[in-house]
Amino acid sequence: MSVRRRTHSDDFSYLLEKTRRPSKLNVVQEDPKSAPPQGYSLTTVIIISVLVSLICQHFVPYAVSTLHTVIKNSPKQKSSPPPSNRLNIGFISGNSPEKYAPAVQKPTFLVDPIYDEKWKGIQTAVPVMSTQTDEKRENDPAKVKEAILAAKAAGRSRKDGNLERAMTIMEHAMALAPTNPQILIEMGQIREMHNELVEADQCYVKALAYDPGNSEALVLRARTTPLVSAIDRKMLRSVHDLRDEFNHLQHSTALRRMMRETYFLYVYHTVAIEGNTLSLGQTRAILESGMVIPGKSIREHNEVIGMDAALRFLNCSLLSKEHDEISIDDILEMHRRVLGNADPVEAGRIRTTQVYVGRFTPVSPEYVMEQLKDIVDWLNDESTLTIDPIERAAIAHYKLVLVHPFTDGNGRTARLLLNLIMMRSGFPPVILPVETRAEYYASLHVANLGDLRPFVRYVAKHSEASIQRYIGAMKTSSDNILNSGDSKLTPEESEVSEKIEAECRAGN
């Protein structure tokens, strides 16, 4: 067995180890307080868990919602061609009436108040009918639950015969969830018991728009549809009777004056419904004397002047055409005059960009001309000409607004097209008052859901009001003539009448 011999280096290491002084730098303190932790305490884990939970419940959904809104509001890619806009338009008339045959000399009911001086020479958006906040509010589960409970309470009151209480409760429920089918059905039943059949039927139609397979709504609507159709036919007949009465009245000085006033009223209301802030008196001053209204924009002035030019074109050119066909050029020429002063670049031009109208997105620009041709083909089709003129005019207005062929001026051009159809059928021009602006857009919104009848009723109601205005003026004039024995035009009115007739014959 070999034994390792001890060396000097071993002795040196041994002595060094024995003589080394302990140093604070070399001594490891085994203080439990300063030792690194081996894990997290229970309190720390709970606090971290609560913070993570709060972040997941509040901050993450907010971030996702914000990102979704940004993506949704960003420009969208071109969509595929939409389905055809051809509608089933025989929903009010029932039996198809015969095509209206106007007199040999087509009447012109708008008297141009401007003499021979020609004017030498704005973009408005359709109001958003509902915002993203409204959509979120309508779909809020808590509010929907409250609305359904309220509807059940209203149903119990309805069955007990307390209709006033039921209606009060349902008004609250409708404010909470206006698109819920159950709420709409209950409101329809209450209105039906109030003998408000048209409103009840409208509730059922909306319920089916949001839930097409709702069996209860289908049964209820099948019950109200024939009754409402009879009411609508009666309404249209009454408007036609008024038109016939108007056409048989003798023209007089009062009628001329009423036509003149109607001209100013039409220009004022049709631009005001798009947001123009000029008053009726200011509109008249611009048209009669070319006055510049202090504090009003040039664009608002140009909107009035453009509508004046479009009405002249309709009154003196389109109404005097030998044939009743409406062409794309007629629509473009009306629009060219509507925007001729406010936006000359876009006047009379089909849009080449995508536009957005609230929650509604019209067709992509590459399909606009195709859709416009469909509208014109529908207007000139023999079967279309057998439809009641009021229905036909309302549908044509809606179709043009649906396509939205221009970047601006679509509503004004659609109302001109509506009046062109009505006036060719013997009706005086229809004024859609700015005071009914909310009803105007609401009925168009319902049409987007698939029911055009509210908009047809809206047009018929204001057509009746326009005829009543003329008849009232003429009857008042007849009473005055019996008392005074004077039925002649004043020299100024005779001069204006002659100039207008000469201008129309020249085709201006």
Swiss-Prot record:
It comes from the Eukaryota. The keyword Cytoplasm does not apply. A motif (Inhibitory (S/T)XXXE(G/N) motif) lies at residues 270-275. Residues 482-508 are annotated as: Disordered. Gene3D superfamilies: Fido-like domain (1.10.3290.10), Tetratricopeptide repeat domain (1.25.40.10). Signal peptide: none annotated. The modification O-AMP-threonine is found at T352, T476. Its main location: endoplasmic reticulum. Its EC number is 2.7.7.108, 3.1.4.-. GO terms for biological process: defense response to Gram-negative bacterium. One of its GO terms (cellular component) is cytoplasm. GO terms for molecular function: AMPylase activity; ATP binding; hydrolase activity. It is found in: Endoplasmic reticulum membrane; Nucleus membrane. It catalyses: L-tyrosyl-[protein] + ATP = O-(5'-adenylyl)-L-tyrosyl-[protein] + diphosphate; L-threonyl-[protein] + ATP = 3-O-(5'-adenylyl)-L-threonyl-[protein] + diphosphate; 3-O-(5'-adenylyl)-L-threonyl-[protein] + H2O = L-threonyl-[protein] + AMP + H(+). It holds the Pfam family Fic. The active site is at H404. The fido domain mediates the adenylyltransferase activity. Belongs to the fic family. This is Protein adenylyltransferase fic-1. It comes from Caenorhabditis elegans. The gene is fic-1.
